[in-house]
Each structure stands twice: as structure tokens, then as C-alpha cells.
Curated annotation (Swiss-Prot):
Organism: Picrophilus torridus (strain ATCC 700027 / DSM 9790 / JCM 10055 / NBRC 100828 / KAW 2/3)
InterPro entries: NA-bd_OB-fold (IPR012340), RNA-binding_domain_S1_IF1 (IPR006196), TIF_eIF-1A (IPR001253), TIF_eIF-1A_CS (IPR018104)
Name of this protein: Translation initiation factor 1A
Keyword Transport among UniProt keywords: no
Function: Seems to be required for maximal rate of protein biosynthesis. Enhances ribosome dissociation into subunits and stabilizes the binding of the initiator Met-tRNA(I) to 40 S ribosomal subunits.
Length: 108
């Protein structure tokens, strides 16, 4: 039970590629629980914040999110999860983010 790596372990939710979830960066707040999000596939989508997330998780411009595009309208989608700055930096450091949305990359 005594593991030295426990201090450095961070558990981060990743998009479920089988269900079509992708990474995105919030570009603009549109109002009425709507956001303009630049997704990893290069498409800018109009995404909505579901009711269960509205009050619990506040989303701002520049946040890294998981988006699930709608099946019947590909230019729209739902926000599934928002990463904290620490989680986003961790994903960037470990090269888990696609180049197109890796705005957290620290130049060395």
C-alpha cells in the first residue's frame, strides 16, 4: 500500500472517442448557456451547457472542455466536462492534447 508515486498521480477524465466526444477550447460566450467552441477537428461549434452543469461548473473563455457534437447537426454540441487550469496544464505537459487546441503549451 505504500506507493511513492501516489503524490504525483493525477486522474484526469479524457474524451470517450467511441461516443464521439472531443476536446475543445471556449472562444466566446454567446449568452443563454451557449458557447462558441473551437474543437480539435478544426470545426467551430455552437455548444450549450446542459442544465445539470449550469450552476455547478462555471465556464469561461479559454477553458479546455470536452464536447459531444450532435449527431443530426454537426456544427452544434453539448459541453460534457470542463478542465481546471491544473488539469489542462497536466494534459499539455504529457502531450495528450492535439496541437490545434494546445494553448497551454509552455515553450521551453
Amino acid at each position: 500500500m505504500d506507493n511513492d508515486n501516489d503524490e504525483n498521480t493525477i486522474r484526469v477524465i479524457t474524451p470517450n472517442k467511441k461516443s464521439g466526444e472531443i476536446y475543445g477550447i471556449v472562444e466566446k460566450m454567446s449568452g443563454a448557456s451557449r458557447l462558441i467552441v473551437m474543437c480539435e477537428d478544426g470545426v467551430t461549434r455552437n455548444c450549450r451547457i446542459p442544465g445539470k452543469m449550469k450552476k455547478r461548473m462555471w465556464i469561461r473563455e479559454g477553458d479546455l472542455v470536452i464536447v459531444k457534437p450532435w449527431e443530426f447537426q454537426d456544427e452544434k454540441g453539448d459541453i460534457i466536462y470542463r478542465y481546471t487550469k491544473t488539469q489542462a496544464a497536466y494534459l499539455s505537459r504529457n502531450h495528450m492534447l492535439p496541437e490545434i487546441i494546445d494553448v497551454f503549451n509552455e515553450k521551453q
